[in-house]
């Protein structure tokens, strides 16, 4: 049978298909094949109408998945016949339609591409040293989108009218900036300026002034892609110390920005995973193991007393221009691959605990007394996005914080269901929205102990829902009723008349790992973190669970230790060590071992009387107790400092470890014998290695027994303690050796930043989980 000379088809592309150069890509492919038709953004994705010979239509569908733009991700193609009588004169990019038939993913921001860098450093190019250069393959996306479909009028560039040259590029199908929505140049784009501490705008080149301030040891506030950064010379001990003092951040490690991997070579070990993460379009902060020379080459205050360093490369043209200026403004990009002397501390511009600042006026007000110079511009940041953080320390990279370049993080789910709004936890808060078989995890909001972060959570819920066009049908939150996120969830559910699903903390941790792996079948779950409220009202932090569609069943926990002074023990690890000594019958040693700690005698009496010493199975507090016994933790200056210092002491693990644990009849794993051994050790490295080695072996045996009892052989791991590389990689290897399959979330954070995904998945797995209308 002869084929018709002409046929028509309509394709709907779903996935990351807007803001990534998909329409220009479709235009080029269609015109190269002689097809007529049009392509347009819609609220559901990208719609393509094609008319032409059947062979050419088939060739288009065959080639499209292999010729996608670098930032695109194609999840599905919906195909239907073109309406009869449809005619086209050539192929065109048509005006967008704001229809909402399916959730559309807002694209994350992307680091500067090589082609834009070539132009940025070419003195003969009209965008030479233009701090807002971008194209369809790179630049800001999520941070400047007001709403979808993704068009210039829906972004913070709407007020910048294109000059004739930019308009020509924008309309030229052969140009890299064909329909690049944030397109800009020195003639028509945003403007950069410098202001001093008095708010006076300074004359001269802003980049030159900024670099001069850094060279003088001053602190620079610069408006980045998703928020402001504070920067100083990472080799200048005085500047780093002053930044710590002004920011009220006494010890928490700072991130380091270098021009390229060659500039990091002497400081950190660059493995394949680390290089890929550093140089990828997300350009996150990457945790890399320090080389011995790092502490001599950097100011002592950059990342004190830790075995790793958080490093990143310039991700925006503005950051790149600081390094270009320091190199003497060379022509071309050859210098950009060579080692450069400039190393910068680059940290979020906020007071510790508060969200990053996004607006110029807010920066002037809130950073007064912190920054010496402000590098500002007038491209508004509509959606705050802190830097993403990725660990490249272990066998495979994993996300610690999802932000700029990664978020909103889209996770395909193994099944669909009602749309869920999940509010996450109190710490490292992020929210999750679902529609059908897709979940979107928001950028990191932060800790909800801060009022500004609480307001950021409220804005995130509104903005992400608006961008995705999702109206939640159910609300999920943590079981703890006093968390701000839980109170917000309760209020939201009441206002909208929606069912509320409180999900136990560790259940959510395990469900997040299941969601990422597309699992609806039962698994063993091992959750290790600081604490979560159990269904019985007790504080738990180390639990063995069976998690399935019908809910979460308790299988065992770490043997509880007393928390002298309650939550204060999480800030003073010596208290946990004192609690361990008391539990070992060695309370008489507390006063002498911790003579330098105020209140040591009072803590000993509290333990003797059992007053204000609630028991907790927290794995995080177990690490604190071990660190305290080894003299590594008096008072924590930031969260998990003692545990991080303990991990940093590990060079290798013992080949064989003594059985310094017990498993009782109630399946509680008791590690007091291990703590007793640590209490008598003076070698901190040997003690840290023994602690990790015994803990890994004990957890593996505990999980293997549960696997034998339940018949389940997949072990989902969750909770912030698994950010410990020694524990994570060691336990996974030991579980595999025992014939079990360990599962880890690597895209969603293992810590509380992934809780919202787990809460949403727990609700989707079991629509019959008992819920209340606005009551937790």
UniProtKB/Swiss-Prot annotation:
Pathway participation: Protein modification; [NiFe] hydrogenase maturation
Reactions catalysed, semicolon-separated, are: C-terminal L-cysteinyl-[HypE protein] + carbamoyl phosphate + ATP + H2O = C-terminal S-carboxamide-L-cysteinyl-[HypE protein] + AMP + phosphate + diphosphate + H(+)
SUPFAM superfamilies in the cross-refs: Acylphosphatase/BLUF domain-like, YrdC/RibB
Database matches in PROSITE patterns: ACYLPHOSPHATASE_1, ACYLPHOSPHATASE_3, YRDC
Q: Which residues form the Acylphosphatase-like domain?
A: 8-95
C4-type zinc finger span: 113-138, 163-188
The organism's superkingdom is given as Bacteria
Q: Coiled-coil annotation: which residues? A: none
Q: Which UniProt keywords apply?
A: Ligase, Metal-binding, Zinc, Zinc-finger
**Under which EC number(s) is this enzyme classified?**
6.2.-.-
Entry's Gene Ontology BP terms? protein maturation
Q: Which Gene3D superfamilies does the protein's record reference? A: 3.30.110.120, 3.30.420.360, 3.30.420.40, 3.90.870.50
Sample GO molecular function, one term? double-stranded RNA binding
Q: Does the keyword Nucleus apply?
A: no
Q: Mind telling me which InterPro entries this protein's record contains? A: Acylphosphatase-like_dom, Acylphosphatase-like_dom_sf, Acylphosphatase_CS, Carbamoyltrans_HypF-like, Carbamoyltransferase_HypF, DHBP_synth_RibB-like_a/b_dom, HypF_C, HypF_C_2
Residue ranges of domain YrdC-like in the record = 204-405
Q: What does this protein do?
A: Involved in the maturation of [NiFe] hydrogenases. Along with HypE, it catalyzes the synthesis of the CN ligands of the active site iron of [NiFe]-hydrogenases. HypF functions as a carbamoyl transferase using carbamoylphosphate as a substrate and transferring the carboxamido moiety in an ATP-dependent reaction to the thiolate of the C-terminal cysteine of HypE yielding a protein-S-carboxamide.
Question: Can you tell me which family this protein belongs to?
Answer: Belongs to the carbamoyltransferase HypF family.
What is the protein named? Carbamoyltransferase HypF
The encoding gene is hypF
